[in-house]
């Protein structure tokens, strides 16, 4: 009887390992596609590929995150895209990712993406949307920082918001510079786990240089 139980346990372990390897391999391949994407169509295709992984795994948060991140990149590149509809899709992916995310640091990463979705909507008409999408974008950063104050992407995005806000409204280079400085410093010690987001460092360095 013990032999049968042991055999079942071994087969179960092998099955879980094979499933895990399949997931990791699929994610690695699709992240490579994401990194090499150059056009809106490329990012749309990559997003669809991550959705397929998410549908197969169901309990993982990273495929949903990357599906949304790819749509965010598409939205910034394609000026003809319906930003409200696109951001709505991103927020939906964020909801699914957050439902699966376990740790506060994982959830903080999702609020990075939520901020970008709200910002994309605000930029359709900044003057009329600042009180809605703009405030929501700021709230997303605050929530992310409350979950993980060491995530450098949060400070990079805060710096971007201040950099692009006119001085008379509380923004400008001088206000943005400390945020970029903090992002650059945090990136130096930020540990990137396998398959996890690994973007923003070079952008933060470049933006800090613009503030000098």
Language model features by range: what are they?
Residues 87-140:
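Hydrophobic, well-structured mid-protein blocks that either form specific transmembrane helices
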Residues 53, 97-100, 143-144, 183:
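Canonical positions in the second alpha-helix
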Residues 174-178, 182-212:
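Terminal, low-structured helical/coil segments at or just beyond the last alpha-helical repeat
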Residues 35-49, 83-96, 130-138, 177-181:
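Helix-turn-helix repeat elements of alpha-solenoid scaffolds
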Residues 56, 100-104, 147, 186:
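Structural marker of alpha-solenoid helical repeat scaffolds
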Residues 129-154, 160-171:
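Outer-membrane beta-barrel transmembrane domain signature
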Residues 20-33, 56-78, 104-125, 151-165, ...:
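Amphipathic alpha-helical repeat scaffolds of TPR domains
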Residues 1-26:
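Bacterial Sec-dependent N-terminal signal peptides
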């Amino acid at each position: 009887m013990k032999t049968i139980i042991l055999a079942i346990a071994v087969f179960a372990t092998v099955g879980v390992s094979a499933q895990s390897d399949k997931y990791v391999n699929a994610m690695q391949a699709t992240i490579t596609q994401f990194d090499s994407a150059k056009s809106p169509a490329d990012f749309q295709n990559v997003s669809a590929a991550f959705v397929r992984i998410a549908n197969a795994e169901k309990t993982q948060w990273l495929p949903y995150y990357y599906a949304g991140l790819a749509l965010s990149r598409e939205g910034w590149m394609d000026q003809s895209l319906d930003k409200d509809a696109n951001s709505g899709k991103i927020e939906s992916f964020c909801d699914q990712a957050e439902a699966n995310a376990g740790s506060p640091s994982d959830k903080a990463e999702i609020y990075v993406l939520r901020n970008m979705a709200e910002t994309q909507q605000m930029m359709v008409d900044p003057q009329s949307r600042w009180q809605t999408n703009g405030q929501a974008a700021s709230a997303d950063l605050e929530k992310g920082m409350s979950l993980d104050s060491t995530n450098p992407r949060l400070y990079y995005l805060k710096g971007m918001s201040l950099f692009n806000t006119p001085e008379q409204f509380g923004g400008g280079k001088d206000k943005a510079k400390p945020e970029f400085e903090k992002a650059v410093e945090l990136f130096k010690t930020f540990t990137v786990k396998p398959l996890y987001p690994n973007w923003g460092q070079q952008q933060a360095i470049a933006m800090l240089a613009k503030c000098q």
